[in-house]
Amino acid sequence: MRRAAAFALPALLLAGCAAASQTPAQTDALTIESRYPLEYAKQFTVDVCAGGYDLITIDGSRYLVVPEGAAAPANLDADITVLQQPIQNIYLVSSSAMDPIISIGGLGAVALSGTQAENWYLDAARTAMEQGEIAYAGKYSAPDYETILSADCGLAIENTMIYHTPEVKEQLEKFGVPVLVERSSYESDPLARMEWVKLYGILLGRTEEAERVFDDAVQRIAPLLDEEPTGKTAAFFSITSNNLATVRKGGDYVAKMIGLAGGSYVFADLTDSGNNLATVNISLEDFYAGARDADVLLYNSTIEGELRTMDELLAKCPMLADFKAVQSGSVWCTSQSLFQQSMELPELILDMNRVFTEDDPDDSELTFLTKLH
């Protein structure tokens, strides 16, 4: 899409991780030729450089993907982290990155996990750990450095939780393990979240696979884009143990999914400029006022766990008995696997569309929604 005039990055300091030990001839400077086209994602960019190099920028942090057989430019800005292909033995801490990597056939590049086997809802990831192909190397705040170093880890993929323990990031980098902090959860559009598959395609040399996977995902919901809104309203929520309702902000990707499915999110006007969180806790009284007349209730099981019956829901919040959706029997619970299955968001959109357009869809035919009876 957009193309930038070629220019050379200025030389500041030699990067600490510059490939001094690489035998291939080095180029002196990095020349940007174009901007890699992204249709939806806003939280990362990729500059395509001469010689097959790719310069990734995420929230001000820069990463240079160096093709196999090449070396990093000699005069490279000191803030740029070098990622030498093939990138192998990845320590994958951000669980939402696993599904895109699996979808492009890149699971073999992952050697270490920040999630234990029993906590994976992705069959391929769980099986790989059970078979010893991927080892548990500790969660983001307490990594097993010995395991990570013995595995010759080529990259740690973290999410922004790592900023709560910056000393861990610093220690990994001190040991020579580059750290990439992904921000897909900050994307406000479901298609933007899925487009992060292209970043993993670039890292793993599987760009064509990533583009094909993303295009297929977009095509799955393409028929809905020509449909008229259904007029149905919906709330997406959970009830906390301290009697608050957790709802998504109006600009969140879940609200966008409800819209793509033909519905209208009842808290579309809810904003909170005080933080970057996608969710906000509101009082049950405020939830009652905003969602009592919603046509559909969608209970988010990710945090508080799955519900199986209407009685379980009413036990958590008896006042829901007054809600229109409860009385009409249009209350649905998401599966707990939803967060990890980040490339399957089109299926949730299609599920929602069936709930909005059919009187009583068979939940055995839905992927992520189960009806509460």
Task: State each model region's role.
Residues 1-15:
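Sec-dependent bacterial lipoprotein signal peptides
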Residues 17-98, 209-236, 360-373:
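Bacterial Sec-exported substrate-binding components of ABC uptake systems
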Residues 54, 58, 63-149, 155-161:
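A short, structured surface patch at a secondary-structure boundary
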Residues 88, 96-98, 113-124, 164-167, ...:
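Extracytoplasmic ligand-binding site segments that recognize negatively charged/polar headgroups
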Residues 89-92, 109-113, 155-159, 179-182, ...:
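Structural recognition of the beta-strand scaffold that forms the well-ordered cores
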Residues 142-153, 282-293:
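Short helices/loops that flank or line small-molecule/ion binding pockets
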Residues 187-205, 209-215, 296-373:
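Structured C-terminal subdomain patch of bacterial secreted/periplasmic proteins
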Residues 246-280:
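Alpha-helical, coiled-coil/dimerization segments enriched in small aliphatic residues
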